Amino acid sequence: MNKLSSSAITTTWLAMIIIVLDQVTKYWANTSLTMGEPVAILPHLNLTLVYNYGAAFSFLSEVGGWQRWFFTALALVVGTALVIWLAKLPKRWTLEVVAINLVLSGAIGNVIDRILAGRVTDFVDFYIGSWHYATFNVADMGISIGAVLLIISEFWLKPRHEKKAHSTEESV
């Protein structure tokens, strides 16, 4: 059997679903919302169309345009590394595989925006009182949730599994 078909790379359909959801919701936001005007959805949650020309929390958003290509290149490098990582994992659903797919989908979703529009469309606005968290999108949710799951997988679950495997080897 082909090495790629027996690897977790075949799970990238999860990333594709998130990418499509991200792009559809961004299209909806761009065609249905008015820039900067919040639409109340729930207490503490608005939909507010904003454009991010930088990175997370609008980091480097006002430095002249070079950041578009810098963050595009960075996301492509990270995305390539994630695909290689998936290709080396066995074909089965683990927390690590789900996490990598979520981060990959978020990176690709935001790269599509940067390439096509030179900016990322954000529209989910969470707030408490007058404090507003950075406005975000579905791709950002994928990156954030995937990163948390990857940390849990790599630093809590894998070490436990490795300790258990090591203690089993010692008892033999």
Swiss-Prot record:
What does the function comment of this entry state? This protein specifically catalyzes the removal of signal peptides from prolipoproteins.
PROSITE patterns xrefs: SPASE_II
* This protein's GO CC annotations: plasma membrane
Which top-level group of life is the source organism from? Bacteria
**Which source organism does the UniProt entry give?**
Hydrogenovibrio crunogenus (strain DSM 25203 / XCL-2)
| Active-site feature positions | 122, 140
The compartments listed are: Cell inner membrane
Q: Which residues cross the membrane?
A: 4-24, 39-59, 69-89, 93-113, 136-156
Q: In which pathway does it act?
A: Protein modification; lipoprotein biosynthesis (signal peptide cleavage)
Q: Which GO terms describe its molecular function?
A: aspartic-type endopeptidase activity
Annotated keywords: Aspartyl protease, Cell inner membrane, Cell membrane, Hydrolase, Membrane, Protease, Transmembrane, Transmembrane helix
On whether S-adenosyl-L-methionine is a keyword of this UniProt record, the answer is no
Membrane-topology annotation of the record = Multi-pass membrane protein
> Could you tell me the EC number(s) of this protein?
3.4.23.36
Any idea what this protein is called? Lipoprotein signal peptidase
User: Known catalysed reaction(s)?
Assistant: Release of signal peptides from bacterial membrane prolipoproteins. Hydrolyzes -Xaa-Yaa-Zaa-|-(S,diacylglyceryl)Cys-, in which Xaa is hydrophobic (preferably Leu), and Yaa (Ala or Ser) and Zaa (Gly or Ala) have small, neutral side chains
Similarity comment: Belongs to the peptidase A8 family.
Q: Which InterPro entries match?
A: Peptidase_A8
Q: Name one GO biological process term.
A: proteolysis
- Keyword Hydrolase listed? The answer is yes
Q: What class of enzyme is it?
A: hydrolase
Name any one Pfam family assigned in the record. Answer: Peptidase_A8
